């Protein structure tokens, strides 16, 4: 690919991911109110449906991502990326027009089936990158996520002021514009002579878990990673419902708070980690990070004023020094010729926890906030997440202890 076309293609992939994440971020602040409107119930009941909507998206994406990845190997990246963008636009239109809650489920399932833009975009970047610029180009994925999660929720909160459905129309419009831009501009990255036949064995979403079973030496660290991912859904799936219920936050305030989350995560992942990991080392980074996560979650659980949530975001987001260090230790425990398989397995693992986490955390919120609850404790999901983080500290300590003995 010519250099000018290559730069344009990389720019398009960055914009694609940015719009994807921005579109997703736009709808987060208004989902609770839209669900309330459709089921004619309070925020507690809406949270339960919100968790199952998260499940519907994550489950279909888990099943279809390997299938879509295989299709991109056979037919090329361009058609898959374009179908993905169109699928997201259809999803957002379904959500905007939804006359009943079941339309939301149908929209989320459509998005889960077609929503392989990140996977296919990563493959696209791998196709057109050289060894010298590969890391820099892949860094654009992280940058798009960070920027999109700052812009999206804030924009969604502002648009939500004009109606719960307005942000969905905005997200659909962004995806359709991106689809049209890609249709006319985006070149194919995978040459026909490099394509391979579709194989149902490679399209098996469970197959990658077998790889982890071949490496019992990392089983403890993998278990800790699972608990961390599940605990994260106390914030990811529950934040909007909790803050609206507990502090009467508007969509605008929810959007601003999530924009702050995106900014803090970006600062920790982009800047702080470069300073902490060389000085603390990977093992201490994991311990300190897990401790910060746990402290932040415990404080969220018992927050009594809205401003406290902003203050408590600081220790929680500082916990972000843990993840990269933990993944680094895991990758060092696996031979270099198995790294691709390992990353595929870790991605499948994250998808699987996204199936479990949302309904677990939102149903727990419902259990402790509905009219017949044994007692009111809206912070229960954060408290459960705190316990999971504490257990992960014990597991990682035990795993490192065993490693030292080997």
Give the ranges of each region predicted by the language model:
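Helix-breaking motifs and short loop linkers at transmembrane-helix boundaries and internal kinks
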Residues: 76, 97-102, 114, 248, ...
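Helix-to-loop junctions at the C-terminal end of transmembrane segments
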Residues: 63-76, 268-282, 365
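Short amphipathic helix-loop junctions that connect adjacent transmembrane helices
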Residues: 30-47, 237-254
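Juxtamembrane intracellular "pre-TM" segments in multi-pass secondary transporters
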Residues: 2-7, 187-224, 245-246
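Cytoplasmic helix-loop-helix junction between adjacent transmembrane helices
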Residues: 107-146
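Conserved MFS/SLC helix-loop-helix module at the cytosolic interface between two early adjacent transmembrane helices
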Residues: 62-101
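A membrane-interface helix-boundary motif in multi-pass transporters
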Residues: 160-173, 363-389
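C-terminal transmembrane helical hairpin of 12-TM major facilitator-type secondary transporters
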Residues: 283-326
């Amino acid at each position: 690919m010519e250099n000018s076309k290559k730069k344009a293609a990389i720019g398009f992939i960055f914009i694609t991911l940015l719009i994807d994440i921005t579109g997703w971020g736009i709808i987060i602040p208004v989902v609770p109110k839209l669900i309330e409107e459709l089921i004619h119930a309070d925020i507690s009941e809406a949270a339960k449906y919100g968790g199952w909507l998260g499940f519907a998206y994550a489950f279909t994406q888990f099943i279809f991502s390997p299938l879509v990845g295989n299709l991109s190997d056979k037919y090329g990246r361009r058609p898959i990326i374009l179908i993905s963008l169109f699928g997201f636009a259809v999803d957002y239109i379904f959500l905007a027009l939804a006359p009943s809650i079941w339309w939301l489920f149908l929209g989320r399932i459509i998005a889960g089936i077609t929503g392989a833009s990140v996977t296919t975009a990563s493959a696209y970047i791998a196709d057109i990158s050289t060894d010298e610029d590969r890391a820099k180009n892949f860094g654009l994925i992280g940058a798009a996520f960070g920027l999109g999660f700052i812009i999206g929720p804030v924009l969604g909160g502002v648009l939500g002021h004009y109606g719960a459905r307005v942000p969905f129309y905005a997200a659909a419009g962004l995806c359709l514009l991106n689809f049209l831009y890609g249709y006319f501009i985006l070149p194919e990255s995978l040459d026909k002579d490099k394509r391979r036949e579709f194989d149902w064995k490679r399209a098996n979403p469970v197959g990658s878990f077998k790889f982890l079973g071949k490496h019992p030496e990392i089983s403890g660290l993998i278990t800790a990673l699972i608990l961390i991912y599940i605990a994260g859904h106390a914030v990811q799936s529950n934040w909007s419902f909790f803050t609206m219920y507990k502090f009467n936050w508007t969509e605008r305030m929810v959007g601003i708070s999530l924009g702050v989350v995106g900014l803090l995560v970006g600062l920790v992942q982009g800047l702080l980690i470069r300073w902490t990991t060389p000085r603390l080392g990977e093992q201490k980074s994991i311990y300190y990070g897990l401790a910060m996560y746990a402290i932040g979650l415990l404080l969220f659980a018992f927050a009594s004023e809205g401003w406290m949530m902003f203050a408590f975001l600081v220790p929680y987001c500082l916990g972000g020094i843990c993840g990269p260090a933990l993944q680094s230790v895991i990758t060092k425990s696996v031979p270099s010729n198995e790294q691709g398989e390992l990353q595929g397995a870790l991605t499948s693992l994250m998808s699987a926890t996204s199936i479990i986490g949302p309904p677990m955390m939102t149903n727990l919120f419902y259990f402790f906030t509905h009219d017949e609850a044994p007692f009111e404790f809206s912070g229960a999901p954060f408290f459960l997440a705190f316990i999971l983080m504490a257990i992960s500290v014990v597991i990682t300590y035990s795993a490192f202890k065993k490693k030292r003995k080997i």
